[in-house]
A protein has these predicted regions:
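Acceptor-binding helix/loop patch of EC 2.4 sugar-transfer enzymes
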Residues: 101-129
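Short catalytic/ligand-binding loop motif for oxyanion handling, primarily in non-cytosolic enzymes
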Residues: 12-14, 43-46, 93-96, 109-112
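Active-site donor-binding segments of glycosyltransferases and PAPS-dependent sulfotransferases
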Residues: 4, 19, 29-91
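Cofactor-binding loop segments of dinucleotide-utilizing enzymes, especially the Rossmann-like FAD-
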Residues: 8, 39-41, 105
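A basic- and aromatic-enriched beta-loop-alpha substructure that forms the phosphate/nucleotide-
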Residues: 87-93, 103-108
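A short, glycine/small-residue-rich beta-strand->loop->alpha-helix junction that serves as a flexible
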Residues: 6-20
Length: 130
């Protein structure tokens, strides 16, 4: 399979750490071809660009919030012809043509039994649900 891993919307913090861990993990998955789109922050965070030959690295700009202006990403996708696109976290501000899977990292929407959640007032809990 040809898989695009999209990190172009990631800027700092835990998202960068999670994406870096994914990049380390895919080094050992040699039966797929990975095309990794890196944000400027991700590119500067990578310790080494020494990746195996089944991983292709692209330094990209941060995507525009107007998805029609993301020509570079669209052009790359058309030339790669991936089987799917995996965006580490959303929102991506880019709508690929290929099937798209997007990660989700806001635990409060998943784990309402967290101690933090119990301390929220009714209004804030309602806002999180909506």
């Amino acid at each position: 399979m040809k898989i695009i891993i999209n990190t172009t919307n990631l800027r700092k913090g835990g998202a960068i750490q999670a994406a870096s861990a994914i990049l380390e993990d895919i080094k050992s998955i040699v039966n797929h071809e990975f095309h990794v789109f890196l944000s400027p922050s991700m590119f500067s965070n990578i310790r080494s660009l020494d990746f195996p030959e089944h991983i292709y690295i692209y330094k990209c700009k941060y995507p525009s919030k107007i998805s029609l202006l993301n020509y570079d990403l669209n052009r790359l996708e058309l030339s790669i012809k991936p089987d799917c696109v995996f965006s580490v976290f959303g929102p991506t501000y880019w709508n690929p043509i290929s099937p798209h899977v997007m990660g989700f990292a806001n635990g409060i929407h998943l784990y309402t039994d967290l101690p933090f959640y119990k301390k929220l007032n009714f209004y804030k809990k309602s806002k999180k649900i909506i």
